[in-house]
Amino acid sequence: NIWIMSALETIESFVEGAPPGELADVIADIKALTVADPGLVSKLGPAFEKYNEEQFATVRLPGSSQPIIVSSHSSLGNGRYYDVESSSSFEYDHATQKASGAQSYVLEGAQAELTHNILGRVTNAGDRKSTLKTLSPYVKEHFPNAAYGVYPTENDSKVAIIIVANKYSPNNFWNGRWRSLYIFDPSSGALEGSLKVDVHYYEDGNVRLLTSKPISTTISSGTGAGIVKEIGNAEKKYQDELNKGFTSLSEGAFKALRRQLPVTRQKIEWDKVASYRVGQDIGGGSSRR
């Protein structure tokens, strides 16, 4: 039993560390490694659920063109989740990452109006349009492949705002994901959250970027427009910091790993490299016989 628990915990760590867009590959590898005990994979349900909720897995419902987020903030329990913008709920298979059983679901509660306002939806009858800036235009402008969601949380006392953008390019051996999570408290105007980037590059090697930045600020207006504006400021600042970090790595640490000159302390004349005689020209003199 001790060995089984140890093996299960190890396999769960594989699931937890699955790179963006590669959960199916990790599951296939786990099955290959546990052929002697195939029952272990069936015990990974909680690990799959934790992974999908933390990674903000996305899924498309039948007939829908917009991806929907799976998270603990949108959970209804028993494997069902809901989406505010499409007013629907669905069942989610965490192992296959497929949705089924879509049903109508209308959000109600103390923060329902603010939630709709952030999304830019009309909350009253008629043709009145929200005067608040919507989250949708911001996401579409800054993220080419993204999903977003706004959910009441903590007994309707706060609002959770989630943005997730995925970029998968397995043919070029890389995949990446951006995750934003904000918790807004209408009573204090506090906006707390985190920004996370996860990129995996695996051509002729295995390199992974995992970075996170906490966000803490106060919004005086407390409107949807004010919230989206502050989100935009925070994410632009983080993007600028990442760009500066990449430039610093390229011009600093990575450059320091390369020799400025060969061991001979002489630069190679690349236009004449075809005529070099190894050990003589590169060695700086006549080769010994």
Segments (PLM) and residue ranges:
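Short, Lys/Arg-enriched N-terminal segments with co-localized hydrophobic residues
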Residues: 1-4
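Long amphipathic alpha-helical scaffold segments
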Residues: 43-146
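Glycine- and small hydrophobic-rich membrane-insertion segments that are intrinsically disordered
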Residues: 106, 110, 122, 175-188, ...
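Short, isolated positions within intrinsically disordered regulatory regions of eukaryotic proteins
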Residues: 7, 197-199, 274
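C-terminal/domain-edge helix-coil "capping" segments
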Residues: 13-20, 43-50, 57-72, 82, ...
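General structural signal for secondary-structure boundaries
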Residues: 27-28, 34, 130, 203, ...
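Surface-exposed short loop/turn segments
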Residues: 89-90, 129, 133, 137, ...
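Charged, amphipathic alpha-helical stretches
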Residues: 6-49
